[in-house]
Amino acid sequence: EYSPTVVIHGIGQSKTYLYENDEIAVDEDGKQITGWPIYANTKYIIKNLLWPLVKMLVTQRDDGFVESFRKTLEGTLYVNAFDSNGKNVYDVRVKKYPQSVAKCSDEDKEEIYCNVPIDGFSKVAGEDHLYYFAYNSFGNNSEITDELYNFIGQIKRETGHDKINVVAISLGGTIANSLFDRYPELYPSLDRVVYIVPALDGSNIVGDIYLGRLSTSDEMLYKNLLPNLVG
């Protein structure tokens, strides 16, 4: 018999929603406002960026576009705003799957298998021994780690197993490493740990951003970046 497996997904492989008055918030068109997938109000974006973009392309210089873009981006991504302690500014909640995949609805199963193609594995190990840990990819690492630790405890109680498999994908590798560092007492409970294209050692790109090594010159923007983006 196989040990139960918990899958820790990668970035953006879960849904998050903005809540107001304990209900999912909607915009003026009745569309649910999500943190991920990123909620984009097309009318708002076009209204704020179209004219500044046209002016920039015609004049080949920043004629207010960068500032307009900054404000528009801020207004578009506001749902995912965090304070200095890594806490959500707004009430953003993750869609959770607190039970085994076997007990999930057909809709939830489809979401899980669409995010991570593990249906082949589930046919071998059994959906009743497969769990999907959903978390906010932009959330507080410590809080997510604590949630995962408690989730693993729940899985062991539900299945009656003493050991568990951990499958960490992409950003999930960072979460798994945090788990093992924060809760070393979990080691005896681990059967197998599988990392799939994991983010284990940080990112060179993020390091370059912090060190100011990214070019922001007009030449880079207008002659290199934009033409490549447009194709």
Say what each PLM segment does.
Residues 1-167, 171-225:
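N-terminal non-catalytic accessory region
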